[in-house]
Amino acid sequence: MSESAAQEIPMSRRQLLSFVTGGAIAATTAATLYPVVLYFLPPSTAGGGEGVAAKDKEGKDISVSKLLAAATPGEPVLTLGLDVNGGDATYIVINDQKEIANFGINAVCTHLGCVVPWDNGAKQFKCPCHGSVYNADGGLERGPAPQPLALVKATVSDDKVLIAPWTEQDFRCTDLWCNKDPYWVK
């Protein structure tokens, strides 16, 4: 040990408390900012560029085998998925053969952004905010919504449902809306 190191003055109590307080503030700030930063980052994709894995209400990946075992044919299942049209609530469509359809439906109303629940009795999506009605494919049946619910592409890979942007033509056509170009693709 050199003689200059032995002559250094040890840290004072005030310096130690300042150091500990600064560390506590830095740790608290980092813990607070971590979820904020994650919010602005794009969601991780499952399986390369194939899409985002659909999640349940707890944020866990949905197992296709468990989903189909519990699903009712013709009744869509609400999941968390791709942020389309300002919201990531997405319906996975279960067809009559009890298979996952190749498309899903974004659950955000095109009028004012309310999440649209499925009415199983009427076999329609009905917006609770202002009464817009959408058919089982998300096609617009009654306004004030100006457009149908946005579509997403749904594929199955490794027992997961992958949701990706729908870029193909819109296959739905109703009396209120019949535009083949997907309005949600920018």
Swiss-Prot record:
Essential cofactor(s): [2Fe-2S] cluster
Disulphide-bridged cysteine pairs: 114-129
PROSITE patterns for this protein: RIESKE (PS51296), TAT (PS51318)
Signal peptide span: none
Broad class of where this protein is predominantly found: membrane
Domain Rieske residues, every copy: 74-163
Subcellular location(s) of the protein: Cell inner membrane
Membrane topology category: Single-pass membrane protein
Cofactor, free-text remark: Binds 1 [2Fe-2S] cluster per subunit.
One of the protein's GO biological processes: photosynthesis
Molecular functions per Gene Ontology: 2 iron, 2 sulfur cluster binding; electron transporter, transferring electrons within cytochrome b6/f complex of photosystem II activity; metal ion binding; monooxygenase activity; oxidoreductase activity; oxidoreductase activity, acting on paired donors, with incorporation or reduction of molecular oxygen; plastoquinol--plastocyanin reductase activity
Ranges annotated as spanning the membrane: 16-38
Family: Belongs to the Rieske iron-sulfur protein family.
Subunit (UniProt): The 4 large subunits of the cytochrome b6-f complex are cytochrome b6, subunit IV (17 kDa polypeptide, PetD), cytochrome f and the Rieske protein, while the 4 small subunits are PetG, PetL, PetM and PetN. The complex functions as a dimer.
NCBIfam families recorded: PRK13474.1
Function: Component of the cytochrome b6-f complex, which mediates electron transfer between photosystem II (PSII) and photosystem I (PSI), cyclic electron flow around PSI, and state transitions.
Protein name: Cytochrome b6-f complex iron-sulfur subunit
Species in which this protein is naturally found: Gloeobacter violaceus (strain ATCC 29082 / PCC 7421)
Lineage: Bacteria, Bacillati, Cyanobacteriota, Cyanophyceae, Gloeobacterales
